[in-house]
């Protein structure tokens, strides 16, 4: 999807514009689901003092300063990262980033409780069986391995990031919400 927009549009548009189009298409395809999670998490954890207040802020449909800044910083980092590599590398890097970041997000469900709308443990979260984890693991890791040593370094960085997020989410609210998973996905991508 979005990686193909960059690959194909760079023939008649400047690389910068092609990357921006690719980012916009990616947001459009996902309905900004993960970006919304990042913004809500940034607002909640940035402005909230206790678990109840954090979750209340995260549920608020308006975006605050923390949320807006987090989106700007993450989009800028994505843009600069893609801009720093050759156009030929972008499709694989893009696919690998999407794949590993989604695996990283659901990986938070292993050590943490999923908190429902009330902030209590929720049984409504889809339970993944061993086959689901195997498919998620292979599809999340394989594209990154195709990047060689740089892909391996990226996986280590994402693992460290998500260990930190896991500790932070557990300490601040006692688990994860869907917004936390979206934040993890965006920060890992």
Show the residue positions of the predicted features.
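Hydrophobic core of alpha-helical transmembrane segments in multi-pass integral membrane proteins
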Residues: 133-164
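Transmembrane alpha-helical segments that form the membrane-embedded catalytic/substrate-channel core
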Residues: 24-34, 95-112, 159-169
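Membrane-helix interface segments
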Residues: 14-17, 51, 65, 89-91, ...
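Short, small-residue-biased leader/transition segments that mark boundaries at the very start
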Residues: 1-6
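Helix-coil boundary and interhelical linker segments in multi-pass alpha-helical membrane proteins
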Residues: 7-21, 69, 73-96, 142-154
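Alpha-helical transmembrane segments and their lipid-water interface positions
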Residues: 34, 43, 69-71, 105-109, ...
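Acidic (Asp/Glu-rich) catalytic motifs at the cytosolic membrane interface
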Residues: 25-63, 165-188
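Solvent-exposed interhelical
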Residues: 51, 103-137, 173-176
């Amino acid at each position: 999807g979005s990686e193909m927009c960059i690959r194909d549009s760079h023939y008649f548009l400047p690389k910068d514009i092609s990357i921006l189009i690719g980012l916009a298409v990616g947001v459009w395809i996902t309905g900004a689901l993960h970006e919304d999670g990042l913004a809500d998490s940034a607002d909640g954890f940035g402005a909230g003092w206790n678990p109840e207040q954090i979750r209340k802020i995260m549920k608020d449909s308006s975006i605050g300063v923390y949320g807006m800044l987090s989106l700007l910083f993450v989009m800028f980092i994505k843009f600069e990262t893609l801009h720093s590599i050759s156009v030929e590398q972008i499709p694989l890097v893009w696919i690998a980033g999407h794949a590993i970041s989604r695996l990283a997000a659901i990986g938070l469900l292993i050590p943490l409780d999923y908190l429902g709308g009330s902030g209590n443990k929720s049984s409504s979260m889809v339970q993944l069986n061993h086959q689901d984890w195997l498919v998620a693991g292979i599809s999340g890791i394989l594209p990154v391995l195709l990047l060689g040593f740089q892909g391996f370094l990226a996986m280590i960085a994402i693992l460290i990031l998500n260990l930190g997020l896991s500790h932070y989410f557990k300490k601040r609210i006692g688990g994860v919400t869907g917004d936390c998973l979206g934040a993890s996905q965006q920060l890992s991508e």
